[in-house]
Amino acid sequence: MAVLGKEENILDFEDRDFPIAIMDTEHHGKVWLHSHSFFEIVYIDKGFSMHSCNDETTILTSGDLFTIRPGEVHAYISAHHTYLYNCLFYMEALDGFSSEIVKLPGMSQILGERQSKWEKLHLDFAERREVLLCLEKMKWEQVNR
């Protein structure tokens, strides 16, 4: 698994040879204001949290999915047993496929420049199961590669 290093509140992978990582974690309390040099897709599995991104604060609940782009500053202000998955990656992980991937439904909003304010998706039950299965499979592949 990729390990994160902290320098001046900017997170980065220590191992750029494998530019994708799946992490699951539980937040409780506050997670300091920070940014990173990679894309972060976040899925909230359980719990709830107040989250700040680009000076906008919102409540996150189970089933929420959102993206943090490189350089965006964000923090979990008040997390209450928030269990989440992070899919962390660099654009080079898409290795030449990024122009095709961006054409897929919803991907231009995730990978392109923000056209408007920070947004999140709230998944229905079937979508949650599908996302969770995919994340768990990716996590297993990461550990067993």
Where do the language-model regions lie?
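Short coil/turn residues that cap or connect secondary-structure elements
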Residues: 55, 142-145
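Short loop segments at secondary-structure junctions
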Residues: 46-48, 71, 92
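Extended, non-catalytic scaffold segments that flank or surround catalytic motifs
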Residues: 24-26, 71, 97
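Generic protein-terminus/edge-of-domain signal
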Residues: 1-61, 65, 102-119
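Short beta-strand His + acidic residue motifs that chelate non-heme Fe in jelly-roll/DSBH
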Residues: 50-52, 68, 73-80, 85
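A hydrophobic/aromatic-rich effector-binding and dimerization subdomain
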Residues: 2-19, 77-143
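Histidine-centered divalent metal-coordination motifs
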Residues: 34-36, 74, 90
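Catalytic metal- and UDP-sugar-binding loop of GT-A-like glycosyltransferases, i.e.
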Residues: 44, 68, 87-89
